[in-house]
């Protein structure tokens, strides 16, 4: 073997720990050294660096600069990139979703609207003692035995028909009773006047009369009075009273 051939042979021979293995190319030798003789444990590397802090062996540098290391790094990038894109797209889509406006109370739940009844169509948002429902008035007991009561006969239709349609009118709601010149700024004012302003001027008959002398305007009012004050007497109760 010539000197050049011997030098070439020994140049690709592993000398780590008396290994002595020969490789055809330098790349194969480096790969062998990296896989079998270089410890990649961080604790071992840190210990070696503390023992020899002035320099780093070229084999450790080549460990991170070889084609195999670069291919591994590219593979990791390809695996991470789709996950990153999916995360970004999902965060953007969540950011575009509009949330429903909150109410002043802070709840997403819409406020409950009370049911509208015929008697509440002209009811004030802040009802006063003058704004009883018509059905509630029917249930009230009569204060006397007479079959007449006083009540305003001004209906909601009459109030609306008397409303001034001129937008510049300060008090558009006028009382429809002939001779009355009262005017009001809102429907609550004219409603209160309609129920109280002419109460003593109009008499309404209460045709439904109880045997006790109480009179009511409707059969419903009389029935409510009878159920509460004159309940039917059962046969068993009559027998107990006769004993």
Swiss-Prot record:
This is Juxtaposed with another zinc finger protein 1. Residues 118-130 have a biased composition (Low complexity). Interacts with NR2C2 (via ligand-binding region). Expressed in range of tissues with highest expression levels in testis, liver, muscle and fat and lowest levels in kidney. Detected in liver and white adipose tissue (at protein level). GO terms for cellular component: cytosol; fibrillar center; nucleoplasm; transcription repressor complex. Residues 89-108 have a biased composition (Polar residues). Keywords: Lipid metabolism, Metal-binding, Nucleus, Phosphoprotein, Repeat, Transcription, Transcription regulation, Zinc, Zinc-finger. It is found in: Nucleus. Residues 89-151 are annotated as: Disordered. Residues 131-148 have a biased composition (Acidic residues). SMART domains: ZnF_C2H2. It comes from the Eukaryota. Acts as a transcriptional corepressor of orphan nuclear receptor NR2C2. Inhibits expression of the gluconeogenesis enzyme PCK2 through inhibition of NR2C2 activity. Also involved in transcriptional activation of NAMPT by promoting expression of PPARA and PPARD. Plays a role in lipid metabolism by suppressing lipogenesis, increasing lipolysis and decreasing lipid accumulation in adipose tissue. Plays a role in glucose homeostasis by improving glucose metabolism and insulin sensitivity. Residues 39-79 are annotated as: Required for interaction with NR2C2. GO terms for biological process: lipid metabolic process; negative regulation of transcription by RNA polymerase II. Gene3D superfamilies: Classic Zinc Finger. It comes from Mus musculus (Mouse).
